[in-house]
Amino acid sequence: AASDVYKRQLNGRVVVIDCVTLWGTNFFFDNEGDTNRSLVELKEEFNKLTEQDAYLIFVTNEIGLGGVSPDAVQRRFTDLQGWLNQYIASRADEVVFMVSGIPMKVK
C-alpha cells in the first residue's frame, strides 16, 4: 500500500491527514491508474484509521468543480478523488467546505 499510517498508535491523539488528494494520488499511481483498486485500498486504510480512538482531521481538495479534462488519466483521478471525498464525508461527524477562507458547514 502507498501508506501505513494506520499502523501507528494514534489513540488519544489529534491526527491531521493533509492532504487526502496527495494520499489518493499515491494509491492511484501505485495501482497504475486503476481507480477501482485504488478506491478499495484507500477505503480499507481509512477504515483502519477510524478504528482507532483518535480525533481525525482530513484536509482534501474539491477538484471536480472545474471543467472536464480531455486527458483520460486526469478524468479517472478526478473521479477517484470525488468518490474518496464522498466516502470520507459520509463517515465524518462534521464536514466543512472552505471557500476563499470562509468555512461553510456541510454536515
Description of each model-found segment:
Residues A1-Y6:
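Short, small-residue-biased leader/transition segments that mark boundaries at the very start
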